[in-house]
Amino acid sequence: EKNAITLHDGDLSDSSGLIRLVGEIKPDEIYNLAAQSHVQVSFDAPEYSGDVDALGVLRVLEAVRVCGLTKTCKVYQASTSELYGKVEEVPQRETTPFHPYSPYAVAKQYGFWMVKEYRDAYGMFAVNGILFNHESERRGENFVTRKITLAAGRIAEGLQDHLELGNMDSLRDWGYAKDYVECMWLIMQQDKPEDFVIATGVQHTVRDFTEKAFAANGITIRWEGTGIDEKGYDAATGKMLVCVNPQWFRPTDVDNLWGDPTKAKTVLGWNPQSTTYEQLVEIMAKHDRERAKREKALKNV
């Protein structure tokens, strides 16, 4: 419907602005999805990441409290599987101990505990959704899954020579962002505020994601070598299409994230497999192949 959405400017580093906005709008629900959400960037800009990802959550909660909306406004905080970091349990669930392993994860842990504190101290309906990796065709291009699907499409169209990646053995639990948003909403419709893991319960390597993205573009990858010497070749032509570049390794890397969505399935009735992993890769690869075709057409104009 036209004009059904009103956009307001807001900044998680500006407490007075957030208080003004919350007081003006008096929302029934707040979904805080704002963050500096790139792990590698948090090593490059740790202070900024802490200001937005840690104190930003506090500013949202405090805005609700200061405006007198603790009993009428629900708050959802987008937390992260990166909290588990150097994992102490596989798969990870709501009771798994946290071991953050990056400035991003440390900042997010502060936000997680502030949500619980405001819930307990002020009786707020404030909840954390511990989101495992959620991807889509709208994913930022600096994230590995989108980097892969864009490269696969461009290579298939002759626009790019090869793809460089970091740790090919990293294990991730990848789901479709659209399905995860449904779970966020379900969490906020409960009578009792609780924290939930949002995950598929299935994990794959970066290597496997790469292989499937190229397959969706009609290219079969043949792997040779190990570690930093690993390379992926086009099985049909023998051309090297994928290689490892140590530049893309993180100073500290989380290598085994795997969520247990049992609580979300049981309590919320949520289906984490609405979109399968294979379908997710296909959606992203198809979208980015079409984009590569448009780029090629413009290049040839």
Residue positions per predicted region:
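N-terminal Rossmann-like NAD(P)+-binding domain of SDR-like oxidoreductases, especially those catalyzing
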Residues: 1-134, 178, 184, 188, ...
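A short local structural element in Rossmann-fold oxidoreductases
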Residues: 19, 88, 139-140, 210
